[in-house]
Amino acid sequence: MEKKILYINKKDADKVRGVHGIALLRKVKILKISEEERDTLPEEAELLKFIGFSSQEVGNFLQDMKKLGIRVNLKCMETEHNKDWSLKVLHKELMEEHAFMKGEQKE
């Protein structure tokens, strides 16, 4: 399966260039989204979705990001469960998961 990433970041062009640079070096296709779909997300939205990657390949990609000082809190691998979710739903789920992992879950 071809490796692809979807990286959304509306505010930090340097991070976008860094993530895209890693993808290009690793021969990973960079997916684009429409402005219409991007507009369904909050202005501060940032997320990274890995498609067609093994766990080890994701780990290697994240190591490259770490070397460049790039941190993305909301990230996931595409699964059968989430592959058809809209970006809005994916972002919401990742926000909830991130809050849970940080111990900020709602009672």
Give the location of each predicted region.
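Helix-rich interaction surfaces within compact, conserved domain-sized segments
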Residues: D14-K15, V58-E104
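Short coil/turn motifs at helix boundaries and re-entrant loops, enriched in small/polar
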Residues: K27, E36-R38, M77-K83
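N-terminal, charge-rich interaction modules
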Residues: M1-S34, F100-M101, Q105-E107
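Short, intrinsically disordered low-complexity segments
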Residues: K29-N60
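Glycine-rich, often proline-containing surface loops adjacent to acidic residues and nearby aromatics
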Residues: M1-K4, L41-E46, R71
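Generic detector of short, locally flexible boundary/turn motifs and exposed helical patches
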Residues: K11-V19, D39-E43, N73
